[in-house]
């Protein structure tokens, strides 16, 4: 699901809200979450999961074109940990590629 698909679905489900208001709400939420993470804050949405930053230490990479070794610096990357309710909800879902493989 893309951001625009999410906005469209929410606008249909909440018919009393204007599509522009739903668009603004979703974009504002995502902007605030991005800002919180860039400030080093952790975001927890009970039952859904939490967003935090994980540190990736410096490592030796390789340039795929030349094969030359390249030193890559350490960095922080966003990390999502699903909550218990979300894990339980998706545990019964059969992945699409497994359904395709059965055909």
Swiss-Prot record:
GO terms for molecular function: DNA binding; structural constituent of chromatin. One of its GO terms (biological process) is regulation of DNA-templated transcription. GO terms for cellular component: chromosome; cytosol. Gene3D superfamilies: IHF-like DNA-binding proteins. CDD domains: IHF_B (cd13836). It comes from the Bacteria. Residues 62-81 are annotated as: Disordered. Keywords: DNA recombination, DNA-binding, Transcription, Transcription regulation, Translation regulation. PANTHER family: DNA-BINDING PROTEIN HU, INTEGRATION HOST FACTOR SUBUNIT BETA. HAMAP family: IHF_beta. Belongs to the bacterial histone-like protein family. Heterodimer of an alpha and a beta chain. This protein is one of the two subunits of integration host factor, a specific DNA-binding protein that functions in genetic recombination as well as in transcriptional and translational control. This is Integration host factor subunit beta. The gene is ihfB.
